[in-house]
Amino acid sequence: MSRWKAAIVGSGNIGTDLMYKLLRSEHVDPVYMVGIDPASEGLARAAQEGLDASAEGVDWLLSRRELPDVVFEATSAKVHAAAAPRYAAAGITAIDLTPASVGPYVVPAVNLHEHLDAPNLNMVSCAGQATIPILAAINRVADASYGEIVAAIASHSAGPGTRQNLSEFSEKTGRALAQVAGADRAKAISVINPAEPPMNMRDTVYAKVRNPDADAIERAVLDMVAEVQRYVPGYTLRLIDVDGDLVTVMLEVVGAGDFLPTYAGNLDIITAAAVQVADVLAQRTLVEEPAR
């Protein structure tokens, strides 16, 4: 069976973890990895796995005789903002793991079906991928007037980009909690925990609701957790409590350990979600092609 050909732009931790996940994909074949550092471990690993790897950037990628069907952007918002129009002009679908937000916010378990034809899809943030599904589930059955999330990640899993852009990621996640999950108002708080040994990603979702039906809320949350677990097996519900109109849900995310340590569930969930998006898009396209 034919598969979508993929390029990974960015050879750091995120890009390298993406590669290992894509190597297991039934529908997406990682063909290229692009970076800017010839000494990058990610590029070396990509070459070992048989990918065509280059430190010559996006110019090199777009000069290939055979272009990819999809590109995973694992660089920076500035880099993606500049490259996105070029991908679109070349007919390449872009899955954006940066804060650039060129395309719509996408969370596979919640709203991917609304954006199947989008040329550019933004993966929100690590915290967003973990918490938006839960708030969306609560909102669907209980009408959330307010949502607030607290995402705690291990210090070792927070690179320079995360640290420098923590406020930006939190603001973006808050916007997505309202836009995608549907809460009237929302706020996101991110915490970097220096504990040793490093802790797994932990998330708490609070929601104030208008229709506090505890049984319906619990069923909705359990169903959503099961849906996310289809592509993030280490996504676990730790607590759900409905106290009047206040709902509290606690989660833990353990990474798959493909490249990153298992405590880096915050990074694992966004790469797993990005691969899930590509798998769904590729499967849909490959099914439709024979009928054309």
UniProtKB/Swiss-Prot annotation:
Keyword Thylakoid tagged: no
The EC number(s) this enzyme carries? 1.2.1.10
One Pfam short name: Semialdhyde_dh
Molecular function GO terms recorded: acetaldehyde dehydrogenase (acetylating) activity; NAD binding
Write down the chemical reaction(s) this protein catalyses: acetaldehyde + NAD(+) + CoA = acetyl-CoA + NADH + H(+)
Please provide the record's keywords in A-Z order: Aromatic hydrocarbons catabolism, NAD, Oxidoreductase
What the entry lists under SMART domains is as follows: Semialdhyde_dh (SM00859)
Entry binding sites for NAD(+) = S11, G12, N13, I14, S157, A158, G159, P160, G161, T162, R163, Q164, N165, N266
GO BP annotations of the record are: catabolic process
Q: Name the top EC class.
A: oxidoreductase
Active-site residues (renumbered): C126
> To which protein family does this belong?
Belongs to the acetaldehyde dehydrogenase family.
HAMAP family according to UniProt: Ac_ald_DH_ac
- The molecule here is called Acetaldehyde dehydrogenase 2
* Naturally occurring in which organism (per UniProt): Nocardia farcinica (strain IFM 10152)
